Amino acid sequence: MDDAGKITSTSHLIVSPDEGTFLDLFKHIVLSDLGSGAKFFRASDQRVPATAAYYSRWPVSVFICKILQLFQMPAAMLGHLTDFLLNFYYQNHGFLGILRNIFLIRLKIPKRGEADFISTIGYLDSRMDLHGTPMVSHQADEVISNADNPSLKEGHNSKIKGALGNRSLMDLCIMASKLAYENTKVVERVVAEHWKMHFVADYGGMNYFQDARNTHAFIFCDKPKDANLIVISFRGTGPFSIPNWCTDFDFSLVGLGDAGSVHVGFLEAMGLGHRNSISSFETSINTKSPGSITELRKESEMAPDHLVWAYDGVYFLAASTLKGLLKDHKNAKFVVTGHSLGGALAILFTCILEIQQETEVLDRLLNVYTFGQPRIGNYNLGYFMQNRLNFPERRYFRVVYCNDMVPRVPFDDVFFTFEHFGTCIYYDSRFFGYFTKEEPSRNPFGIENAISAHITAWWELWRSFILNHVYGAEYKETWESRMFRILGLFLPGVAAHSPVNYVNSVRLGRELAIPLMSLKMMAQGY
């Protein structure tokens, strides 16, 4: 990257499950045939594929993606059917209601995209209200003033401690992350009626590699005029979306100069490029977003062909809207959040703002909270962002629940070196939280972790029947959530990824008396 903040190097290593066959994968794993393994790679340095084929854990990723791709159409059909049946059941008020409505000839047929059509994720956790009371404007004022209060900045110690203590903001973030899975009408209704806030926009950005408008984010403020808080929430991994899951397991990297290497799939999800045209990443990232959504739409009409697609991506849509809101609301600060893939996009959004040297925008960043976020880049990206984002105060908090598999992918190994950065808030299955540099058990498929993970899954299933008796009706789990926990008996890391666990962790979490890493060590930047 040069002095103007322009990306001048786009080295890359693309791992493509489609480039080889199951036979090639078998020959590589069983017969140690490096030539067969190298078929799955495409790199800027032609010497790299053979080295990568020898050293890394990529066969696990490729095998998982190839198996998942076999079920892409059935999974999509199952997702549509599940959504329809759940909405049909609840909109007609259960089995007896269905029979009654048939008899009265007033059976209700759910319509996707309507304000009462809830996603499967929404039925896993039916809570829509913020914890206690909505974060009304004066509470948003407190969040901002506390963040700016110098008396709270004793080193970094108090600031870190405040991350667990500021439950209203954390709760708003996890609820916004969960709400991002819903359609626009549901999002608008919940923001306005349940949270008493101001809905701004809901965007569906184009992913040109997957040829689908499947990246979503919505934006809202605490009030329509003189807002203090702006929130951007990115949608996470769809439970029945095979392309989303393959993106999480993808190993592909593209180098962005001094900023290190970034996950290709996440850049594509943001609409910032296409792996079959590596130069597209350089072009889009070297182009700053316009100052408002109105300016973006005007410029997109006159933009050259190589930028039209980028302007239709969720990054440019969200960044332009944010800039316009920051101009309109002079005292506002903004928060970026997301669950799962949405968490990766949330922190990547912030990284791109930094790479583009959007200093005026980043000066008004309050926090980034991600929940169950996968790794988005290598060590160099973390090194590039750490001092810029977490100094002089920590603004990026990565929340991880227990055995959740997604924060542990893509795998880190001696070749790809995917690594997290920022401050990790880790919650165990009893909702004890502590600060750490990295969540324990970095490899979700290690045999040494299998026994404890399955024991925890049994405990979580049993806990789902008693939590409401201990903490109140708010914590009564739906039968859909319990069914998902039964799946967790076989795949613990998948069931642990449920937003139910993250909402409960934020609301019931308490700090571990003797954390594995002390706050003092964290304050010293360990």
Curated annotation (Swiss-Prot):
Molecular function terms, GO-annotated: triacylglycerol lipase activity
Reactions performed catalytically: a triacylglycerol + H2O = a diacylglycerol + a fatty acid + H(+)
Residue positions of the active site: S340 (nucleophile), D404 (charge relay system), H497 (charge relay system)
Coiled coil region boundaries: none
Membrane topology category: Single-pass membrane protein
Listed Pfam families: Lipase_3
Cellular component terms (Gene Ontology): membrane
Entry keyword annotation includes Lipid metabolism: yes
GO biological process: lipid catabolic process
Enzyme class: hydrolase
pH dependence: Optimum pH is 4-4.5.
Keywords: Hydrolase, Lipid degradation, Lipid metabolism, Membrane, Transmembrane, Transmembrane helix
EC numbers for this chain: 3.1.1.3
Motif GXSXG boundaries: 338-342
Entry's transmembrane regions: 79-99
Subcellular location: Membrane
Function: Acid lipase that can hydrolyze a range of triacylglycerols but is not active on phospholipids. In vitro, hydrolyzes triolein, trilinolein, triricinolein, tripalmitin, trilaurin and tricaprin. May play a role in the regulation of lipolysis in germinating seeds.
Family affiliation: Belongs to the AB hydrolase superfamily. Lipase family.
UniProt name for this protein: Triacylglycerol lipase OBL1
Source species: Ricinus communis
